[in-house]
């Protein structure tokens, strides 16, 4: 499962704010966050850059919270 909800909540942001960053609607972002819709590679990269974490961390493929270089 994606870790985007935890990342968002840790920064006290709402879904609409993140949706704007990844150029989508709040409704679509909500579907991504709840696993009802897949995230595109482009949106995944935008989130990784915004949160300064790896895409693997967001996708739950690693537990290492490594910042992007």
Feature map (PLM): residue ranges:
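Short, basic-rich loop-to-helix N-cap that marks the start of a DNA-contacting helix
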Residues: 36-46, 65
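Short alpha-helical DNA-recognition segment
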Residues: 12-31
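A short, Lys/Arg-rich alpha-helix, primarily the initiator
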Residues: 1-10
